[in-house]
């Protein structure tokens, strides 16, 4: 089965799992679980997606310990964006070819559908974009068994209770999928990379996208006083806990 087909099935599953969980909680007066799930989903998206797979694994914008690194790697994997080497490699390629015909999700050269579901593609990338990832045993393992691991995790959660896949992973998956596809890859690149307060609020700092493209080696997109970057603040908090101080 093709990579894109597997990813479509995975995302389709997360849609169904989330819808079922919300319906079950609604008819059984368990909406408090949904509220807790939303809080978990926010942390899940920030730590695994924006701080982890994006700013740490893709851009190496900060250093952390092995435990935090492992947590970020696996939380990011559970979101269902795709295999780590593929996703990270595509994003590095995007930065190298931003807003050109080679950019895999440029709104100038791609349709809405191609941008939203751009991660269905598994292009062959030059080793210069992924060589460091291929040296990492944990990432190689996750790359090789990605879909089997997610199937196992979701089946286990289903056996415990049918609402768990949707509450624990579905909400976070759908949020990062649509926020990345619609806001960051599309709206934040209309007319080139741009900054937008609303997008930044909705994506916990990722919406200061022009700042990010100016210098992706920095873990925070906060340049002007009002450009609050929640993800950057959380990274800073982690770094302070580990090192005692951080610039």
Per-segment meaning from a language model:
Residues 1-182, 208, 218-247:
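Non-catalytic, topology-defining segments of multipass membrane proteins
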């Amino acid at each position: 089965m093709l990579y894109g087909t597997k990813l479509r099935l995975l995302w389709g599953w997360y849609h169904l799992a989330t819808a079922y969980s919300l319906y079950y909680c609604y008819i059984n007066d368990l909406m408090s679980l949904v509220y807790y799930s939303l809080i978990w989903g926010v942390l899940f998206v920030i730590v695994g997606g924006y701080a982890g797979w994006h700013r740490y694994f893709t851009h190496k914008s900060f250093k952390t310990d092995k435990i935090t690194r492992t947590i970020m790697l696996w939380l990011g994997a559970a979101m269902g964006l795709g295999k780590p080497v593929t996703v990270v490699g595509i994003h590095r390629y995007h930065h190298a070819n931003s807003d050109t015909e080679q950019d895999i999700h440029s709104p100038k050269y791609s349709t809405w559908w191609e941008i939203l579901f751009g991660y269905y593609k598994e292009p062959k990338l030059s080793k210069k974009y992924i060589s460091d990832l291929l040296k990492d045993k944990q990432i190689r393992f996750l790359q090789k068994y990605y879909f089997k691991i997610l199937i196992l995790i979701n089946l286990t959660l289903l056996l415990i209770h049918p609402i768990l896949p949707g509450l624990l992973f579905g909400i976070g998956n759908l949020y990062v999928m649509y926020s990345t596809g619609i806001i960051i890859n599309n709206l934040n690149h209309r007319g080139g990379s741009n900054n937008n307060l609303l997008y930044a609020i909705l994506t916990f700092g990722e919406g200061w996208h022009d700042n990010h493209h100016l210098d992706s080696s920095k873990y925070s997109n906060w340049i002007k006083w009002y450009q609050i970057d929640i993800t950057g603040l959380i990274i800073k908090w982690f770094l302070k806990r580990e090192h005692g101080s951080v610039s």
